[in-house]
């Protein structure tokens, strides 16, 4: 298996789906697709038909993987994290395999191994594909799923041109070349759905998750979240690393489950966000979100 990922042109991607589904009823190898029941849950002014979805990880970097996850029943997509370091520079820093789970799981992956512009294109391709596939194949409501951005890992990088352009493009894809390309391809392949395709919303994402590396200080986390809430007006999640549980709790839990041979020290537990700092920080952030109507 190649260590490098190669995005598939959108027309080729859609022809693959159409041919495979017509031939054997599969969608990228998913034999039995989930068909929504009509029920849905509210989130950020949108609806999701199931409360499940792939977290931001290597599995969600390419459009075809997002489509496959949707076919299997996922409806909330936290797409892979982007940051100022990307592409070959990032890939060179990630040990292989980046996730090893023969027994316990070891995770050394980081953010997207594509370039940030490539990542945005993949997510917009997946968004447009799912809008049409959900309707044409009857998988569910075209408005029954949500894309959630993930960004890291410092405010300077997030405000920089590369990541800022990504955020703006995900919030409004109407001026991106890939959004126009996707709509033209879809109208060619599904001419009976032209009016629906023309009406596909360019608002790919209205929410964001703040991903924090080990050691990101609480004040930096709060600055990032505050910026995304007040300046970008995005519904905002903040990921807390498992280290917030404390070293003793983590050690005791693993030991009780038979994983006493796994070795780790207290360094990250001491350097990461502490519970005592997290609680008042989230209270302040919630108050800020309330004041911004989020």
Predicted segments with their positions:
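Active-site entrance/lid segments in N-terminal catalytic domains of soluble metabolic enzymes
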Residues: 2-5, 12-31, 36, 56-58, ...
